[in-house]
């Protein structure tokens, strides 16, 4: 079983050289089990990774096979006690099916070994160092071909006699350093660069020259070749990576000479900050690269190797993440001691060192979730679970996130998260709410608590929230009372809590809260009293909503004090509250009674309480008293007179005395003359009553005052004989403007005579004109047709032998036979009873 190691740790074998909060791409574990025994006794010099197993070549020349967990696997390789090679194994290759293994060594041998069959085993001895060998990868091939590289590139295949036949493919500049075979293309590296050989065309597609590193030899660095697909070749050599595409030449390129069908096109070339120890494809534009750092430690030792994910573009690249790996003995290794194998289908990569093997697996969803949680990236973890699923429930992450936010005192964010994640789960809500209780931050979650019938929490939860608001935020407490349905909590318990924690500084908010709570409980009288203490006009809305007209009978004065207009809007409606009740309540507040009765008079002019307005108008608004006395008849004149006399309201007294008539009218005139002293008013008073005694009294009084005689003369025209006034003037008495006044009076009488004469003449003219028109109309003939019937006998009016004088036609248009009416004169038409008889013929 593979031993699991910490993902990334400075003290362990893998550290991230990025910032700690950057999400890793890989998780790592070290291979152990049977493999560790081999590593204790020997050193790995080369390796091959297959989908089924792992094969390692050692310094002592052995070839060992293990499963992916490091357990030894029995095969033909392990059946033999002898070493496969005499010295260190240089290269291992496995066919696609995992049936044959090819190895080579400095002992000059190349061995082709069937793991489970010996039918096609071969052992070739070249008598010189053999660095690379490669099996044909084609899984459909029954007869395996292989390529050996020394100072030439040689293909071995069977002839007709089933014997191996060597075919020299290419001569080599120096020696073959690396081979990678895929389909019909063989990529191989020499001392000057990389070539691709086309087996179908039996030709090289060209040389990709490689830059020689300064103060180094190119052959001192292992060239790493890998096909990411059948037309894309990855090359990593020294500190340069090149991505090449094998494509067919276009028509223009193919026309320029005898050239191969295919061409090698480098599509991306970039340098790294380290030496390349191996590479593999990760995605369309990403590579996994094992690197050896160029720098040395302070002790001039090698630094830890790095595993990078690089995203490449045309001629540049970007390191997505870089992990520094602590492998056993790394300080003593060189760049060629490391290799990178991979199972691309499973995104699993093997970092192979002489004394250690570490597996890097692309981090899975659950691993990512674990890392995100560990680094407090809860939001990203929940998004990942929502998108890709996983073994960790999203609610578990949400709970951890809530705890984290509460620890950071981000209470509002935690509350919003509750709303988003807890849904309508009552149990979850109650569980999470108690976390806010411990922080005394129920106020933060209050706006998000479920209040619907689908998810109603325990009343105790809502009460705890209200108590916290009552303690720390009275305004917020009031808002909750307004917003929350009253059935969520025990209203009486909250009312008691307010009384126990009443603070005068927040009296307004607490009184309004009590008013609302009392109304929720149906105790409307208490609610009204709270509103009135508060002087809150919402009391009127409450009265209308719940029709509390019986309740307000004892609260009329406070309601008027709060808002007179709103109060009267209710009090003036007899259907809601009786007038008698209102008047009784206002008896001891004369001003409010005046306001009420004055408003009531406008709405109900015949109300029985209007007589009280006389004394009220006398006190609060005298200007309304006289119009009221003139307009209303439902009061006692004597009582009104007493009130007016007490206040010396002379115009009102004059009006009342005038209404009484007789002696009282003379008293009224006397008041006008001696108290009010208004001649025009006196004249108008006499005109109104048209009493000769009043006129005589007026004339006698004012004849003593020459300066106002002319005013009397002007005023009495058409009402009293001016001769009486003139007769009262004494001989030799000087009357200002008398002449003008007399002329004016005479002209007035003259004008009246002319108007009367003209009116008579006009009337006579109209009479004669209308009379003439009537006579003319009555003499005019009337049409009678043959279709008309007698309205009595219903026979045609005009028949043979009928005399015209025997027909009678009425104004309404109906006609009769004269014999039918038996000689009687019709006063009305029998048909329509509308017109009198007008014409008889």
Swiss-Prot record:
GO terms for biological process: autophagosome maturation; cellular response to starvation; crinophagy; determination of adult lifespan; endocytosis; endosomal vesicle fusion; intracellular transport; lysosomal transport. GO terms for molecular function: zinc ion binding. It is found in: Endosome membrane; Late endosome membrane; Early endosome membrane; Lysosome membrane. InterPro entries: Clathrin_H-chain/VPS_repeat (IPR000547), TPR-like_helical_dom_sf (IPR011990), VPS41 (IPR016902), Vps41/Vps8 (IPR045111), WD40/YVTN_repeat-like_dom_sf (IPR015943), WD40_repeat_dom_sf (IPR036322), WD40_rpt (IPR001680), Znf_RING (IPR001841). Belongs to the VPS41 family. Part of the homotypic fusion and vacuole protein sorting (HOPS) tethering complex involved in endo-lysosomal vesicle trafficking and lysosome biogenesis. The HOPS complex facilitates docking and fusion of lysosomes with late endosomes and several other types of vesicles. The HOPS complex is also involved in autophagy and crinophagy (the elimination of unused secretory granules through their fusion with lysosomes). This is Vacuolar protein sorting-associated protein 41 homolog. The gene is lt.
